[in-house]
Amino acid sequence: MQFTKLATILLVSLMGSAAIAAPATNNAAVDAAADATPAVEKRGFGCPFNENECHAHCLSIGRKFGFCAGPLRATCTCGKQ
């Protein structure tokens, strides 16, 4: 019984560390226009509760708009188009 618990904990921890250490594979074609104006992403700045604060932050750094995106809408994403 102890061996089963130990083996389970070891297996889960190894899978977790492998998931963190694995490089991301991105084989998608990149659009040249998308590369010219990358989005700026920062945590906080009002997200996820005050999207207007995120928008104001993006305007203050010279971007055209801002919105809350990402997991749980916790990242302020600024766009330029």
UniProtKB/Swiss-Prot annotation:
<dbReference type="GO" id="GO:0042742">
    <property type="term" value="P:defense response to bacterium"/>
</dbReference>
<feature type="disulfide bond">
    <location>
        <begin position="58"/>
        <end position="78"/>
    </location>
</feature>
<feature type="disulfide bond">
    <location>
        <begin position="47"/>
        <end position="68"/>
    </location>
</feature>
<keyword id="KW-1015">Disulfide bond</keyword>
<feature type="disulfide bond">
    <location>
        <begin position="54"/>
        <end position="76"/>
    </location>
</feature>
<protein>
    <recommendedName>
        <fullName>Fungal defensin micasin</fullName>
    </recommendedName>
</protein>
<keyword id="KW-0964">Secreted</keyword>
<keyword id="KW-0732">Signal</keyword>
<keyword id="KW-0165">Cleavage on pair of basic residues</keyword>
<dbReference type="InterPro" id="IPR036574">
    <property type="entry name" value="Scorpion_toxin-like_sf"/>
</dbReference>
<keyword id="KW-0929">Antimicrobial</keyword>
<feature type="propeptide">
    <location>
        <begin position="22"/>
        <end position="43"/>
    </location>
</feature>
<comment type="similarity">
    <text>Belongs to the invertebrate defensin family.</text>
</comment>
<keyword id="KW-0044">Antibiotic</keyword>
<feature type="signal peptide">
    <location>
        <begin position="1"/>
        <end position="21"/>
    </location>
</feature>
<keyword id="KW-0211">Defensin</keyword>
<comment type="function">
    <text>Antibacterial peptide with potent activity against both Gram-positive and Gram-negative bacteria. May kill bacteria via an intracellular action mode to affect protein folding. Does not show effects on tested filamentous fungi or on the yeast S.cerevisiae. Does not act by destroying the membrane integrity, which is consistent with its nonamphiphilic architecture. Acts more rapidly than vancomycin, suggesting it does not act by inhibiting cell-wall biosynthesis. Does not cause hemolysis and has no cytotoxic effect on HEK cells.</text>
</comment>
<dbReference type="InterPro" id="IPR001542">
    <property type="entry name" value="Defensin_invertebrate/fungal"/>
</dbReference>
<dbReference type="GO" id="GO:0005576">
    <property type="term" value="C:extracellular region"/>
</dbReference>
<dbReference type="Pfam" id="PF01097">
    <property type="entry name" value="Defensin_2"/>
</dbReference>
